[in-house]
Amino acid sequence: MDITTVSNGLRKVLPLKYCGAVIVAAGNASRMGGIDKVMAELNGEPMIVRTARTFQTCEAIREIVIVTREDLVMPIMKLCAEFDKVKAVVVGGADRAESVGLGLGALSEKVKLVAVQDGARPLITHEVIDRTVRAAHSYGAAAPAIPVKDTIKVVNGGVVSSTPDRKTLQAVQTPQVFDLDLLKGALKKAFDDKAEITDDCSAVERMGMSVKIVEGDEKNIKVTTPLDLAIAKLLLEEKK
């Protein structure tokens, strides 16, 4: 039995680590046709508030930092004033990786695990959060994902160059959860290497670390277009 197996076994029997959340809502919503997706309303409340409320009421999450645009810091602070787990609302950086790093810096010293969440995934559930946090507690890094339904093509110059086996493909969602020190180190290395990363898992993967995949939720969509927003509203109506 190797040391990694022993370490993972010990993690599984220890109490759940103190987990903070960084909710990233600092984008400019360029694909939303003039709609500010951070403040877009779903069932009468801004999308960021709905996302934050789910983390506020999830037992696995102990504290929250929200990262947003400078013009939204005060409005979001007021909207989330009732959420006692929200410890800070901070201004984001030039890109997602920098914004996540700024959020990590605002967490308390108690935090050992961190869940990084897209603010634009307002239909996240306690079940997915809890499942991912527990997997990260055991493995050090975890993310929810769902199987890809469409056939995916790799295209170069407008011509198909290959077709990956669909059975090996998963669409990764958030929250992506990590040991805090692991994610900090991974983001720093990506920054030092000037590497382009598309999500937080990518930074960790670059260091040769494995990310545990857990069952995601088809309804945990990311709202990036007006059509996505319309679908999110329909899904919420369906819940009533």
Predicted region positions:
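Short phosphate-binding loop-to-helix
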Residues: 81-113, 195
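Short, high-confidence coil segments that cap the C-terminus of an alpha-helix
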Residues: 61, 111, 138-141, 209, ...
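Hydrophobic helical membrane-anchoring modules
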Residues: 2-4, 8, 220-240
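Conserved core of the sugar-phosphate nucleotidyltransferase
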Residues: 123-214
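Acidic helix N-cap motif at the loop->helix transition within catalytic regions
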Residues: 73-79
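Short active-site oxyanion
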Residues: 60-65, 87, 140, 219-220
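Residue-level signal for inorganic ion chemistry
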Residues: 23, 48, 103, 117-118, ...
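N-terminal glycine-rich phosphate-binding loop and ensuing alpha1 helix
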Residues: 13-71
